[in-house]
Amino acid sequence: MTENSDKVPIALVGPDDVEFCGPPAYATVTVKPSGPARLLKVGAVVLISGAVLLLFGAIGAFYLWKGSDNHIYNVHYTMSINGKLQDGSMEIDARNNLETFKMGSGAEEAIEVNDFQNGITGIRFAGGEKCYIKAQVKARVPEVGTVTQQSISSELEGKIMPVKHEEEALVWVAVGQPVQDNSFLSARVLELCGDLPIFWLKPTYPKEIQRERREVVRKTVPTTTKRPHSGPRGNPGPARMRNDSRPSVQEDSEPFNPDNPYHQEGESMTFDPRLDHEGICCIECRRSYTHCQKICEPLGGYNPWPYNYQGCRSACRVVMPCSWWVARILGMV
């Protein structure tokens, strides 16, 4: 054998020589993707598709609700107060039994919320330091359908509303102390007042009118007490019949029912006089008008007649004919 031939035993092969014994690089085996990775991809696709469907469903439901909801309606109008044109708006919320009136803008804005469910009216003036409430009759605001919306628009929009301001009659004056417990107020009235102190309003008449009202009461009481004894004496005549049918006598003899302000008598409809007195609607009117009321602060200290209040501001609202309201409440129109 040749001396130069080197034979190395396999047992003597070092670790550096093992790489020569391995398979070539192109002979590596391909590994298949694992199952959890595939499931993650499928889950992500399903999740994104579901989110997109929910988004489109929410958008469709919102537009469907917005188009079919007829419980809230807004109308804007123009009124003339002391020769100055001012914009106003009325919002009817039949679902919550509320009416909201806004008059003026900026520092002259006045907001009135009528809560017919609880029989409370809330009034707030821009820049004021107080919020006012007063009691009112309870009623039910009709739902505002398409026909009613057209009727309100034709009645109010595009016209200058006449103003009825009782300068020498009724004045609302705030009491001296604020309300301590406001739990009886609705959420809408509390939202209107915010953090301002809330004061009750009490009706106040000038001294001359108070004396006239007392004189009328003195003259009316003897007449009503002697009426049962005057029947057999004969026919009282047309003049006596007219006096007996005056609304003032009906107000004294019939209690006011806030749950049924409309009474059916035969084929005609009669209205409770307090609906007109409280400014809910107008019994004798054939068209709507703007009713303004004076909200004043009490004059502290010595109160010389007739200056027992100060700092008066006006809050105005639209008053519709009672026949217009009852037609919609009873579903006649």
From Swiss-Prot:
The keyword NAD does not apply. Residues 211-214 form a propeptide. Glycans are attached at residue 243. It comes from the Eukaryota. After cleavage, the post-translationally modified ChM-I is secreted as a glycoprotein. Residues 212-269 are annotated as: Disordered. The keyword Transmembrane helix applies. Disulfide bonds join 131-193, 281-285, 282-322, 292-316, 296-312. Keywords: Chondrogenesis, Cleavage on pair of basic residues, Developmental protein, Differentiation, Disulfide bond, Extracellular matrix, Glycoprotein, Membrane, Secreted, Transmembrane, Transmembrane helix. InterPro entries: BRICHOS_dom (IPR007084), Chondromodulin/Tenomodulin (IPR043405). Residues 104-201 form the BRICHOS domain. GO terms for biological process: cartilage development; cell differentiation; negative regulation of angiogenesis; negative regulation of endothelial cell proliferation. It holds the Pfam family BRICHOS. The chain crosses the membrane at residues 42-62. One of its GO terms (cellular component) is extracellular region. PANTHER family: CHONDROMODULIN-RELATED (PTHR14064), LEUKOCYTE CELL-DERIVED CHEMOTAXIN 1 (PTHR14064:SF6). Bifunctional growth regulator that stimulates the growth of cultured chondrocytes in the presence of basic fibroblast growth factor (FGF) but inhibits the growth of cultured vascular endothelial cells. May contribute to the rapid growth of cartilage and vascular invasion prior to the replacement of cartilage by bone during endochondral bone development. Inhibits in vitro tube formation and mobilization of endothelial cells. Plays a role as antiangiogenic factor in cardiac valves to suppress neovascularization. Belongs to the chondromodulin-1 family. This is Leukocyte cell-derived chemotaxin 1. The lineage of its organism: Eukaryota, Metazoa, Chordata, Craniata, Vertebrata. The gene is CNMD.
